[in-house]
Swiss-Prot record:
NCBIfam families recorded: EF-Tu, PRK00049.1, PRK12735.1, PRK12736.1, small_GTP
Keyword annotations: Cytoplasm, Elongation factor, GTP-binding, Hydrolase, Magnesium, Metal-binding, Nucleotide-binding, Protein biosynthesis
Designated gene of the protein: tuf
Name of the featured protein: Elongation factor Tu
Record-listed GTP binding positions: 19-26, 81-85, 136-139
Renumbered residue ranges of the record's region G1: 19-26
Enzyme Commission number, as recorded: 3.6.5.3
Length: 394
């Protein structure tokens, strides 16, 4: 069956369900589509369609993710749900499924569990801006005091990891009752979507952020000067604007004297465009792949940072052995590899393949970087890990 095209007239937000295994993330995802389908805002998707999530490859890592889309009165949503805990870890660290917000699912019958904690921590580390809580399976709890206790525990846990635990909306309901079409089940889903609509902030569009373009290639065009090519990551570049060349060497200033796309001259290039940018007075040898063009002052080069990293298992084509302190692989940022040294936290002697870990990295050359930047770890051209910059240290 052909997928119905959604009219993209409403603002778009990417969200996902997170939480402990068997707390009802996939049931909730199915319930949202089934309840919203009644008002024409979704295509009803059954639990087993979502649970059979296809495998995808993101930066050399295989991740199983299910995608559904739906809309409320105010917004259009793309929603991701992962079958296994490892898929969540990989998804959040690689940014394969960008999340502007999350729905944390907690079983009222069990309360917060180890993966509940881990997902909240990961969400904080990778910069998920906001989350709403769905306290699921309330049909299995008879004692209102117990519900209150679980809610309190969840709020404390959120606060502990740096989210505003006292403010976050917590909706109580039963995904199963919603799937069965019971009115109280559906009412909770509608309440949840109202909370998601109002509490999860509208993301800043890529074109509204400062201009940034990773350099992929550099050419010299006789009589015209130096042209750099790449895909604009964020913002807009107009002819005549000053820009900086950042990373690997000292930051240089230059001016954009032309923007070209598909052999046509444009007045500007914007986020998502593959363009060639002509630089005034910049020599071919002064620019190289791995640097970025950026709005002056918007991004700085750094060589020391803290990261949250997922290390590929042997089965995924990663290392067969753990690595220890002072391990020196290549870190692939945007378009280039830079060698760096890993410093593990004092309580960790090694990191096993298949684990995720937090550690500090020192690069041999600085890279244009901001918190939230994704990278791969490579050894001789093969990906052995994926990470995200959580804190810049210098």
């Amino acid at each position: 069956m052909a997928k119905a095209k959604f009219e993209r007239t409403k603002p778009h937000v990417n969200i996902g369900t997170i939480g402990h295994v068997d707390h009802g993330k996939t049931s909730l995802t199915a319930a949202i589509t089934i309840v919203l389908a009644k008002t024409g805002g979704a295509q009803a998707t059954a639990y087993d369609q979502i649970d059979a999530a296809p495998e995808e490859k993101e930066r050399g890592i295989t991740i199983s993710t299910a995608h559904v889309e739906y809309e409320t009165k105010n917004r259009h949503y793309a929603h991701v749900d992962c079958p296994g805990h490892a898929d969540y870890v990989k998804n959040m660290i690689t940014g394969a499924a960008q999340m502007d917000g999350a729905i944390l699912v907690v079983s009222a019958a069990d309360g917060p569990m180890p993966q509940t904690r881990e997902h909240i921590l990961l969400a904080k580390q990778v910069g998920v801006p906001a989350m709403v809580v769905f306290l699921n399976k309330i049909d299995m709890v008879d004692d209102p005091d117990l519900l209150e206790l679980v809610e309190m525990e969840v709020r404390e846990l959120l606060s502990k990891y740096g989210f505003p635990g006292d403010e976050i909306p917590i909706i109580k309901g039963s995904a199963l009752q919603a799937l069965e079409g019971k009115p109280e089940g559906e009412k909770a889903i509608n309440e949840l979507m109202d909370a998601v609509d109002s509490y999860i902030p509208q993301p800043v569009r890529a074109t509204d952020k400062p201009f940034l373009m990773p350099i992929e290639d550099v050419f010299s065009i006789s009589g015209r000067g130096t042209v750099v090519t790449g895909r604009v990551e964020s913002g807009i570049i107009k002819v005549g604007e000053e820009i900086e060349i950042v990373g690997l060497k000292d930051t240089q200033k230059t001016t954009c004297t032309g923007v070209e796309m598909f052999r046509k001259l444009l007045d500007e290039g914007q986020a998502g465009d593959n363009v060639g940018i002509l630089l005034r007075g910049t020599k071919r040898e002064e620019v190289e792949r791995g640097q970025v063009l950026a709005k002056p002052g918007s991004i700085k080069p750094h060589d020391k940072f803290e990261a949250e990293v997922y290390v590929l298992s042997k089965e995924e084509g990663g290392r067969h052995t753990p690595f220890t302190n002072d391990y020196r692989p290549q870190f692939y940022f945007r378009t280039t590899d830079v060698t760096g040294t890993i410093k593990l936290p004092a309580d960790k002697q090694w990191v096993m393949p298949g684990d995720n870990a937090t550690f500090t990295v020192e690069l041999i050359k600085p890279i244009a970087m901001q918190e939230g930047l994704k990278f791969s770890i490579r050894e001789g051209g093969r990906t052995v890990g994926a990470g995200v910059v959580t804190k810049i240290n210098n």
